[in-house]
Amino acid sequence: MNTHPTLDLAIIGGGIAGLIHLHYARRAGLRVVLLERAPAVGGLWRELPPWQDIQICTVDWTVGDLPIDGPLQPQVLANIESWVSRFGLAPDIRTGCAVKQARHDGQTWVLDTSTEGTVRARHLVAATGGHNKPWTPPVATRDGSVAECHSSALREPSELAGRRVLVVGGGASALDLLDQSLLHHAAHIVWAYRSLRWFTPTNKRKAVAGSVRPVARLQAQGVPLERQNEQVRADLAARYHHFGLQALQPERPLDLAADQVFPGRATMLAALAQIDRHRGEVVALQNGQAALSDGSTHAIDTVLWATGYRTDLGYFANPALAAVTGVNELSARCGCIFRSLDEPDLYFPGVGLEGFGATSWNFAIMARSIMSHIAGTAHLDLEPLPRRLHHLDLVRHLAARDPVSFGGQDPDDYCREVGLGTPDDQPYPMP
């Protein structure tokens, strides 16, 4: 590609965000290429084990009539791949192509790649995700006597049968691993966490309970954020009381500006009394035991790390970007939701979906406005935001800066039409 003319746009990452941005770039008539280091598209969802599932309803994951047959990893991956086949994206995708370095030379983005030589583009979408590097905390003492596994690497949960398991973490992945440990008959389960995150206690399956629609309706009606918080807090308090989970309530009140509320796990909730819970960190793994910072010691066969992911932007030549390790940190370095303040013509769509929202639909809304900005029909400013925007609030923000894409429709009218007019059992329409 060294002899090719400068492109309008390069996209790094072939997960759901990258493919959606590729579709909207092609629809806008831009000269574009998508670079994916893996042998095939799918991003993190290609790497996850088959038992992993989404934290929201399937109708909130997909968009329009793109098919999704269920919430599990193979079904989610098939949905991601359907973007390629439905919209004929393959000609502009380069798989097995790692970006070794991305730098701006004052005029264009220059990408040094592993298989395509040097790619130049006026604009760059970094769609490598905000959670793309599994992370486990340091442990002062390890002697190898205890097996360790990150949630993303647990391929066969059946291997937990009869084992003494320690689950570490207080978020959604921890609840998943507790559920898997119970379903596959671990002999003993210890749960250690520094802090807990809010979840929705429920007996329903995640794929049913994880709907974004209740909050979306509040947003569509123009309910102020603090009143949204009050209503959701009251609902959660009633649910925690009903399930007898007051001991698991986080210390900090829920704030929809910062928190993602994910569904509880019915199996874990039903068997909570069987789980040995501790607030603390792992300080040592030796002699077949786990020592926690609360002073307790536990005989353990396997540690399951539900400690999440870090952001890896090490491919950027800009040291400030390369040093970023988290989505909140990256979001603070952006204006207008996802425009980089460190480099020109650089977009991080992943920060726009940190919280709650309808995944593909929100990415599509962002992608459409980015392409309008590149084409000159929208003006996405560089104004930093005081807080993250989610779902329909994100739509309102972009509609005011990209009226052409929204057909000149009043942003509030558009949000009411979509948020109140879309049946709960149907995906949002394709933007």
Predicted regions and their residues:
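Conserved N-terminal glycine-rich FAD pyrophosphate-binding loop of Rossmann-like flavoproteins
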Residues: 39-63, 199-215
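Short glycine/proline- and charge-enriched loop/turn segments
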Residues: 61-65, 143-144
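Active-site-proximal substrate-binding core of FAD-dependent oxidoreductases
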Residues: 198-203, 375-402
